[in-house]
Amino acid sequence: MNNFELRGGGGGGGVRLAKKPYDYFKNINIPGPEPWFFFGNMLQLMKKRMAKFDKEMKQKYGKVLGFYICNQPHILISDPEMVKEICIKQFAVFTNRYDMFPPDGVGDKFLSFLTDLHWKFTRTLLLPTFSISHLKQTMGIMNRVVKNLEENFSLFADSDKAVEMKQVFSCYTVDMIASTAFGIEVNSQKNPDHSLIKCFDKFFYVNFYDPITSVQTLFPVIPKILGTFGIKSNFSSSLQSVAKFSKDVIAERRKNKTVRQDFLQLLLDAKLENVDKIDDDMKHELETLTFENMSDWRSKRGLTDEEIVAQVVLFLFAAHLTTSTALSFFSYILVTQPEIQQKVYDEVMDVIGDVSFPKILAQDQ
């Protein structure tokens, strides 16, 4: 066998090995679009955008299908019962997520991207934030923020100008999160040019055709390489801007030594002291940790400052976009369907009347 045959055989083997990941869904009989070598279905996804891509894929391949981002397999599930099983009943099984953030000390430490026992531990610390008793304590604060929104609506009603409701609800949501979770008054409803609002706008309206952002999206390993050299896209820059805001909030809370029953206080109470002085025995214990001795871990292993900031940023982002977008669509439906608007109002007033936490809670019984 000559050198040409050896090289040809080696090259062919390399190509087959590179193509092997694209056989994953075929091997387990999950339908889906044919992937392109190296890119998978990523270019189709970017061209059509996520909503259109998902809709077309569901219509063509059914409620469960597989596609690839580069050589990484992804399963798209549109079956409500299956989604319920995965996200609620079996959620503890699906803890680890797709790793997409560079090592910037913020995004890579989000709860949603932590893995295994690190995820379980951090999630356990955050659970009290969403308890009924905590939500009840924040009702008065929430009412004040809603009052500001009502005053704004009155001003809108008295003017003949068009109103950008997405911006209105964006400011409202920021005010609600900042006051209930962090004990600070942003009042962006009165000041829509607040720096935090600008950070959110920059983050959520990322241009995915920006060269650096496109590369980071297409090739998940690239952000980690770029991040080590300090190269950032608008996405990463806006993330760092909100992280700086979060650090300032944390510093102010520590400086004033104020204790509140809120999300931020839970994180600060879990602060890991002397993080640089963990001995080798404890490091070994953390590395070999099992779920059974996790309660002992909590008493030893708190959260680092980076982890605290990351969860604050995640809380701000996760709560902001989902809530403000839902309210924007809801307001559009009500204003274009006045008969439905009146029906909703009448039923709320008939069943609940003036809103209070006990009345809301009673509706679930």
PLM region spans:
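Cytochrome P450 I-helix active-site segment
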Residues: I30-P33, M139-N143, H194-F204, T258-L266, ...
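Hydrophobic mid-domain F-helix/FG-region of cytochrome P450s
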Residues: N71-K84, K147, V163-S188, D201-Y205, ...
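Cytochrome P450
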Residues: N2-R7, G14-V15, K19-Y22, N27-I28, Y68-I75, S133-R144, S154-S179, I184, ...
